[in-house]
A protein has these predicted regions:
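Alpha-helical scaffold/interaction cores of sigma-54-like transcription cofactors
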Residues: 1-639
Length: 639
């Protein structure tokens, strides 16, 4: 075996020796004698086969004082009590030993220590960060191929197209242009992006003509061209082709109910024309910049709702199309929260349950101006301070080791909706494990990187959500068909149906998503909604903070209070909400209208307001004031 590995890896193959000599009574004392025996042969084989030795230490915790906490963690993971004589034991030597400790431990084999440093010098820098790894979408050959595009377009053509705006104006310096081409993967990748971008434009404009009719208005054409330009020059047309493909397959091939759209993707006219969403962003003043902003380079994120039963069918369709080795779910790591850490440690130490519950209940739900963890809770709660200094060693140790184990990974799960579709076998890019599919019982691939890390790797995440509401609607439509012989298309139901508004006005909304609470029903009866915009506004206002504006909103609708605009031109965007700024989109549109903010600047303003970034707002205030004054608006009103 040694010779085989040496032939395979050459000078990069080493023999590893370890020495874990237990020094405390309650530890694994069987390991070290076996290591002594094995190390003797390793040194012999090292000379015989001319393979270098390295010395290492198995590392499971940071330093020696964590050994006892690790011991309790092993009890938790194996389901054993601390005093169980048959439980798994480590040597308690498995900490990250210092150079001095390793030199002392392996003083008799200095060449092995030297070889360990040699091995360290061979380790190359590696980063998991990567540009987006876009799956390949099959474009019909009669539309065009990459090879045809390489013959048809020069690199100069591509450079001009990707460094100009949608109107053909040069918007990047030569240096910035070259950097952009490099970031997108170079000219080789650009041919693919252009092909996908052109095909996406064809599908989008075909959809626009079906929805808006011909000829398209200048407003629609300008919006479509702007969005398609951003999608293409950010390198994402393939993403939208893939999403529209599985959504249309769900609707037309699989008979699965698909939601009308949620989140910032509803601001895309291209998504609307492709059938990804069912909301017209132009009609409702929804903004594309909230979804994709060239000033904020990040992957698109479209959450797609399917009926509960159909979600699994869509995932199987995607897996069959792109290949089982290229589709994976995303792992989740469950960590030990404060109260759970106390209860877990108490259980393995056999602290009485009543005392365990008492200690856990002492932990507050939140601590003013501080993060909730056991360390801060002890400072905040005198009874926990007393427990930490208790004369009872079981109580004292419970607090001590719970504090050390809090935040450790307790178990793994599978992300409820996140799914990766990869260009290559997913194992080429990230480590994977397997998990059981709850629906089919079959094994499925799961990335070992969690969601917060996945985007850095460049892998493309799609969110497939199962929504019970869609299942209920689907079942209701089927029941109507069976009992009344009526074929109903939910998408064709008149949004201005008076009978429906009567139900809302009477507060009869039990079972209606986001409109069923008693408080919401009360306000609906007072509002007497008569337009879809009324319902949208009420939904947006019914949350902590904006709720204070609901009485004023209702009074303005019914004429009990005048509808006032600080600056007359603001009526353009505040008319539907009776002069009250309800939506973040209104903030963005008003900043452009009043102060000539760019699309990117208006989005930055939205984020700063949403996150209460005082410094950012103070920084943007002079620009807003200056822009408003240039447009002839009163400085005092602008203030």
């Amino acid at each position: 075996a040694i010779q085989w590995y040496k032939n395979l890896f050459g000078d990069d193959f080493y023999l590893e020796m370890q020495r874990h000599k237990a020094t405390v009574p309650r530890a694994n004392h069987e390991c070290y004698p076996l290591q002594v025996k094995v190390n003797k042969y390793l040194m012999e084989y090292s000379k015989k086969f001319n393979v270098k030795l390295v010395c290492t230490n198995d590392v499971h915790f940071v330093d020696e004082e964590n050994a006892e906490a690790h011991d309790r963690l092993i009890c938790l993971s194996t389901g054993k009590d601390l005093d169980d004589p048959t439980r798994m034991l480590y040597t308690k030597q498995e900490w990250m030993k210092t150079r001095e400790e390793m030199n002392e431990l392996f003083a008799d084999v200095p060449e092995a220590l030297s070889n360990t440093l040699e091995l360290l010098d061979k380790v190359e820098y590696y980063s998991i960060d990567h540009a987006p790894i876009m799956p390949t979408f099959a474009i019909p050959e009669d539309f065009g191929t990459e090879e045809e595009y390489r013959q048809k377009f020069t690199e100069k053509d591509l450079y001009d197209e990707f460094t100009q705006d949608e109107h053909g104006n040069v918007v990047l310096s030569e240096e910035d242009g070259k950097a952009k081409i490099k970031r997108l993967g170079g000219y080789d990748k650009l041919y693919r992006i252009k092909l996908e971008g052109d095909y996406l434009a064809k599908l989008a404009f075909d959809g626009a003509k079906r929805i808006y009719g011909e000829p398209l208005t200048e407003e629609v054409k300008e919006r479509m061209n702007f969005e398609l330009y951003i999608m293409k020059t950010m390198g994402f047309p393939g993403y939208f082709l893939i999403v529209q493909d599985f959504i249309n397959a769900a609707r037309k091939e699989l008979g699965v109910s698909v939601g009308p759209g949620r989140g910032s993707a509803a601001g895309s006219a291209v998504a609307y024309c492709l059938g990804i969403t069912k909301i017209d962003p132009i009609q409702y003043d929804l903004l594309f910049e909230r979804f994709l902003n060239p000033d904020r380079i990040s992957l698109p994120d479209i959450d797609v709702d399917f009926d509960d039963d159909g979600r699994g069918e869509v995932l199987r369709w995607v897996t069959n199309k792109y290949g089982q080795e290229k589709v994976a779910h995303i792992i989740t790591y469950g960590t030990m929260a404060t109260k759970l850490a106390i209860k877990d440690v108490a259980r393995v130490q056999k602290l009485p349950l009543s005392e365990s519950d008492r200690l856990a209940k002492l932990v507050p739900d939140k601590i003013p101006d501080k993060k909730l963890n056991l360390r801060n809770a002890i400072e905040y709660v005198p009874e926990l301070q007393a427990a930490e200094a208790s004369s009872d060693p079981l109580v004292r140790d419970t607090i001590k080791y719970a504090k050390m184990l809090e935040g450790n990974v307790r178990g793994t799960g599978v992300h409820a909706c996140g799914t990766i579709i990869c260009r290559d076998d997913i194992t080429d890019w990230v480590p994977v494990s397997t998990a059981d599919d709850k629906e089919t019982g079959e094994k499925m691939l799961v990335t070992q990187y969690e969601g917060s890390v996945i985007e850095d790797t460049g892998l493309i995440k799609m969110d497939f959500l199962g929504l019970k509401t869609l299942s209920i609607i689907k079942e209701a439509v089927e029941n109507i068909r069976l009992s009344r012989s009526l074929e109903i298309d939910v998408d064709q139901i008149d949004i201005n149906d008076p009978a429906t508004y009567k139900l809302y006005s009477d507060g009869r909304t039990i079972g209606t998503f986001q409109f069923e609470s008693a408080g919401m029903q009360k306000y609906l009866r007072e509002l007497q909604p008569s337009t879809f915009e009324d319902l949208i506004a009420m939904n947006a206002l019914y949350r902590p903070g904006p709720m204070d504006y609901i009485p004023d909103f209702i009074d303005r609708k019914h004429g009990r209070k005048p509808i006032e605009y600080d600056i007359p031109v603001m009526e353009k965007y505040l008319k539907d909400t009776y002069g009250i700024t309800v939506y973040q989109e209104q903030v963005m549109l008003l900043s452009r209208l009043l102060a000539d903010f760019t699309r990117g600047e208006s989005d930055a303003l939205r984020k700063a307001m949403g996150k209460k970034l005082r410094d950012k707002l103070d920084h943007m205030k002079p620009k807003f004031s200056e822009g408003g004054r240039k447009n002839g608006h009163d400085p005092k009103v602008l203030e």
